[in-house]
């Protein structure tokens, strides 16, 4: 339940940051899923620099709510709310949000690669291209297509994102867990 909203808020933030088109089924779904939280937050947290900060804050608050609910369910509740516990929740939410962005990027790259073969002119193509282009462009400058048509940059990007998930993100998770000691 929380994950759906977290990914919805993140997708909305990324779509606006990368100027992706919203006039498609996925864009309409993201707006329908997130408007209830983002619109009121925009009154307090306006967009700046081309970024919809309200969407990112909504994702962060949803991540905090998820972590607190899991702590309440799977532990005997908060033994005592301390500054250390608050710092753990805030840091853990930031790391989990970063992890969610990486997983979202992996899924979007896979969808874009599959749809480029199956339905290159489909209604989601422009959206997926807008979301993946900023990540694939630097790789495409260095790695040309094989035989002129086979682009391996999505695969390379997925491997790089997986490596980021395996090394720095795990280190960050361990550092956050150390806050509990």
Model regions: which residues?
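Selective transmembrane helix interface/packing segments
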Residues: 1-181
